[in-house]
């Protein structure tokens, strides 16, 4: 049986010239010459570039099938790897046999025809868009980043923990959660006071899709010392922007016996590790993004890796913004949550490097963040990156039960809803810290693709849950 080879392995020189192999993939283009030859560009998704197959007109099905091949048809090609006389490719496939696996019904109406399509159009055909150069490249980069994240944490001695997607806790205390229910909406059970009786629901209480795996992750960090979660999270935030998704993936490490400084160091090490990985492993895709999407993609990643992170207190960041002379769209004052324009000014113009902003006002941060000695700020941090702004948000967690209880009450939350979280402070509490990295936002940064809807396979946004 002939060896099956990926296009990536052939183009990387892992297949010897003169070897006969079988390539399975799809037609990107077909070009015919007057000399009785056809040139097929075949891709299989294993890398950015297709391989060229040279087809002689003496192949058995040349007239009946080869000359009918169009963009999108699937083929199985067996032939010999030969050196290519053409520029831009070291080798090509001299076809001996071609089987057509699948035809395109109507090439005239095929949504992924060889012409260039707008990114907006591609969202309407999300089931077919991975066949395009841009979305195929995004998918490979996404895979590379995910694998690098897992490798990084494994090498650092972390354990991956699967936290629940269905929860009764609101980690952020923002209330923007999707309710999970099996109740009949046309015949809802009611309490004596007329409220919906969730005790009759599937879980016996009000339940939601998770907004974060952090609280559950903390329980495992307080036993295994170093853990991380990596999975989907959900926000019922009615935001139609290029930065928001209703369903997205989060990376959330949690470290016991750790301070905010330890947290910031972990964030820096992780980001630099995964950026090195993508530069080493996906050069072909990054060159495409550099040429067609954002000319600074590769330079930005290299600069990030070679930069020392600046560190600054929130209060000092506010002073810098006030003294900048910039007319910001959102006015600056102590107590505001920094907007994207503020973050990008700090990272791109003032420091010209990644920045860790820390010790934020407690009133704009979540209940679980450790209260500082000044009583006004919490041990929170945001990592700001040139070109995007906030890329990571984290904190040292509040390990003191009495302080945590006070914060829960201040936020208008119910202590009984967090009984198990409070237990972590009652039984062998330790200082601990962690952060959250929005995985899709990381991909936006790495690829230069502007809209977050284009870096997740099937985006979920307000009034859009197609496919």
Curated annotation (Swiss-Prot):
Its EC number is 6.1.1.22. GO terms for biological process: asparaginyl-tRNA aminoacylation. GO terms for molecular function: asparagine-tRNA ligase activity; ATP binding; nucleic acid binding. It comes from the Bacteria. It is found in: Cytoplasm. InterPro entries: Aa-tRNA-synt_II, aa-tRNA-synth_II, aa-tRNA-synth_II/BPL/LPL, Asn-tRNA-ligase, Asp/Asn-tRNA-synth_IIb, NA-bd_OB-fold, NA-bd_OB_tRNA. The keyword Aminoacyl-tRNA synthetase applies. Keywords: Aminoacyl-tRNA synthetase, ATP-binding, Cytoplasm, Ligase, Nucleotide-binding, Protein biosynthesis. It catalyses: tRNA(Asn) + L-asparagine + ATP = L-asparaginyl-tRNA(Asn) + AMP + diphosphate + H(+). Disulfide bonds: none annotated. PROSITE patterns: AA_TRNA_LIGASE_II. One of its GO terms (cellular component) is cytoplasm. The keyword DNA damage does not apply. HAMAP family: Asn_tRNA_synth. Homodimer. Belongs to the class-II aminoacyl-tRNA synthetase family. This is Asparagine--tRNA ligase. It comes from Histophilus somni (strain 2336).
């Amino acid at each position: 049986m002939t060896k099956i080879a990926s296009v990536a392995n052939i183009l990387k020189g892992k297949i010897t010239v003169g070897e006969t192999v079988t390539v399975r993939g799809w037609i990107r283009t077909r070009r015919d010459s007057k000399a009785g030859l056809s040139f097929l560009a075949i891709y299989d998704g294993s890398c950015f570039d297709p391989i060229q197959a040279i087809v002689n007109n003496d192949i058995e099905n040349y007239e009946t099938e080869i000359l009918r091949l169009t963009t999108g048809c699937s083929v199985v090609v067996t032939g010999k790897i030969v050196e290519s006389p053409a520029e831009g490719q070291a080798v090509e496939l001299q076809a001996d046999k071609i089987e057509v696996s699948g035809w395109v019904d109507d090439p005239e109406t095929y949504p992924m025809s060889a012409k260039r399509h707008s990114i907006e159009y591609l969202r309407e055909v999300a089931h077919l868009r991975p066949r395009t150069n841009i979305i195929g490249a995004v998918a490979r980069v996404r895979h590379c980043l995910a694998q690098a994240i897992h490798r990084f944490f494994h090498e650092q001695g972390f354990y991956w923990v699967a936290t629940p997607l269905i929860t009764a806790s609101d980690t952020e205390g923002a209330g923007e959660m999707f309710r999970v229910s099996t109740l009949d909406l046309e015949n809802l059970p009611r309490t004596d006071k007329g409220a919906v009786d969730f005790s009759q629901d599937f879980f016996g209480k009000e339940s939601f899709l998770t907004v974060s795996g952090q609280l559950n992750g903390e329980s495992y960090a307080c036993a295994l010392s170093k853990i991380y979660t990596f999975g989907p999270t959900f926000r019922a935030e009615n935001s139609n922007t290029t930065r928001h998704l209703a369903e997205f993936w989060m990376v959330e490490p949690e470290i016991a016996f750790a301070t905010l400084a330890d947290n910031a160091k972990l964030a820096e090490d992780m980001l630099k590790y995964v950026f090195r990985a993508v530069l080493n492993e996906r050069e072909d895709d990054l060159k495409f993004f550099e040429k067609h999407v954002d000319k600074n993609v590769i330079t930005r990643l290299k600069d990030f890796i070679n930069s020392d992170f600046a560190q600054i207190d929130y209060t000092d960041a506010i002073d810098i913004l006030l003294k900048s002379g910039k007319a910001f769209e959102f006015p600056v004052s102590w107590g505001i949550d920094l907007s994207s324009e503020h973050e990008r000014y700090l990272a791109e113009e003032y420091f010209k490097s990644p920045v860790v902003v820390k010790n934020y006002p407690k009133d704009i941060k979540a209940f679980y963040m450790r209260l500082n000695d000044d009583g006004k700020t919490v041990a929170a941090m945001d990592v700001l990156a040139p070109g995007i702004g906030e890329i990571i948000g984290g904190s040292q967690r509040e390990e003191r039960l009495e302080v945590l209880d006070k914060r829960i009450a201040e936020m208008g939350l119910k202590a009984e809803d967090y009984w198990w979280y409070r237990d972590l402070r009652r039984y062998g509490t330790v200082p601990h810290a962690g952060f959250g990295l929005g995985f899709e936002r990381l991909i936006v940064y790495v690829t230069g693709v502007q809209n977050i809807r284009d870096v997740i396979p099937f985006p979920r946004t307000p009034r859009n849950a197609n496919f």
